[in-house]
């Protein structure tokens, strides 16, 4: 019985130290940066409530990643020599819609929460696969009667 209690105690202590390490691992480094395959964004938030802290951090990261996508898509859209002012405006609206739609598919790849002085601070990193975002943008453009005739897909893909 003594051995059983000792083993349970030892398992508890080792489990707690592993849990503490997992909770204090920073969400930094190249593994959490945007690369050729993924758009990634990080954010931090603080609140008196742990859930509110996480929600605020995810919302801030979502905003950051949608801004990245918009900037990349607008830069790639400059490759479209056939777009006039009306098409640019329509394209911008389409990008806005696609980024909102894709932001619903965010994946949290790192989350770190800690508490100090009665407040919770949460760091998160979210990601979206670039290939999926590009595919959604292209499919939306191809489904638009006005834009599909002017759209130069290969130039857009190369610039994206």
Task: List the predicted regions and their residue ranges.
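Domain-level marker for long, solvent-exposed, non-transmembrane regions
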Residues: 22-160
């Amino acid at each position: 019985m003594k051995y059983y209690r000792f083993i349970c105690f030892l398992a508890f202590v080792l489990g707690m130290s592993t849990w503490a390490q997992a909770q204090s691992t920073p969400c930094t480094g190249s593994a959490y940066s945007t690369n050729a395959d993924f758009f990634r964004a990080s954010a931090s938030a603080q609140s008196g409530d742990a859930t509110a802290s996480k929600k605020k951090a995810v919302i801030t990261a979502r905003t950051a990643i949608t801004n990245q996508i918009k900037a990349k898509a607008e830069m790639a859209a400059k490759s479209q020599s056939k777009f006039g002012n009306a098409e640019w405006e329509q394209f911008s609206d389409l990008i806005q819609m696609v980024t909102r739609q894709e932001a619903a598919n965010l994946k949290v790849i790192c989350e770190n929460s800690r508490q100090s002085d009665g407040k919770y601070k949460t760091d998160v990193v979210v990601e979206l696969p670039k290939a999926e975002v590009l595919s959604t943008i292209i499919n939306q453009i191809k489904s638009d009667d006005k834009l599909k005739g002017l759209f130069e897909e290969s130039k857009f893909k190369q610039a994206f």
